[in-house]
Amino acid sequence: MKIDLNADLGEGCASDAELLTLVSSANIACGFHAGDAQTMQACVREAIKNGVAIGAHPSFPDRENFGRSAMQLPPETVYAQTLYQIGALATIARAQGGVMRHVKPHGMLYNQAAKEAQLADAIARAVYACDPALILVGLAGSELIRAGKQYGLTTREEVFADRGYQADGSLVPRSQPGALIENEEQALAQTLEMVQHGRVKSITGEWATVTAQTVCLHGDGEHALAFARRLRSTFAEKEIVVAA
């Protein structure tokens, strides 16, 4: 069995360099919620050094609230903003001899695109316009995954090690209790259940079906590095290969 392990980087966390030795894919902030040209260059350089797949992590224009503010923007605006961000990272990667491999939206852009078909379409269209060979990463079973497939893009369905799930397979909003899993044992058990058995127990006790092709590790968690190491060790014990 094989699984991709990804982390959001270039967001001002001190653990980026170490996380890049543990993950197989990096989602690099493109300036709209965090990061800038220099951090994008630095993350690309480290990703290349560690053989980690390079990905863009575009966001709504919301540095004030780290891309977590809900926005109702016209689809054409979202298309242009997404194309702008991923185009910048693709060029930075190419300038350093690397190749951008995937795109994963950030924060509220990701969450809204999971449920809003027009928004999902705008993102998928921007990814396709930039490079039809790019992989589009989205929440398992979401509108974003459906939109990507409609454009003929390769898609990758994502699950979260440290997020609570609702009965319909969507994430518990961060504003609600149960959104974040602080207990390492619980996060580890949830991850293995999703990867090995394709299901996750919701906060209300029901099982939701999920397709786990990539697991997100949040680099901003208090114990992110320790958990990442433990997850890698557990995957090795279960003969689960980590690869992009």
UniProtKB/Swiss-Prot annotation:
Record key words, sorted: ATP-binding, Hydrolase, Nucleotide-binding
GO MF term set: 5-oxoprolinase (ATP-hydrolyzing) activity; ATP binding
GO biological process: carbohydrate metabolic process
InterPro entries, sorted: Glyco_hydro/deAcase_b/a-brl (IPR011330), LamB/YcsF/PxpA-like (IPR005501)
Catalytic activity entry: 5-oxo-L-proline + ATP + 2 H2O = L-glutamate + ADP + phosphate + H(+)
Pfam families hit by this protein: LamB_YcsF (PF03746)
EC number: 3.5.2.9
Gene3D superfamilies registered for this protein in UniProt: Glycoside hydrolase/deacetylase
Function of the molecule: Catalyzes the cleavage of 5-oxoproline to form L-glutamate coupled to the hydrolysis of ATP to ADP and inorganic phosphate.
Matches recorded under PANTHER family: 5-OXOPROLINASE SUBUNIT A, UNCHARACTERIZED PROTEIN YBGL-RELATED
Quaternary structure annotation from Swiss-Prot or TrEMBL: Forms a complex composed of PxpA, PxpB and PxpC.
HAMAP family given in the database record: PxpA
Family of this protein: Belongs to the LamB/PxpA family.
The protein, known as: 5-oxoprolinase subunit A
Native organism: Escherichia coli (strain ATCC 8739 / DSM 1576 / NBRC 3972 / NCIMB 8545 / WDCM 00012 / Crooks)
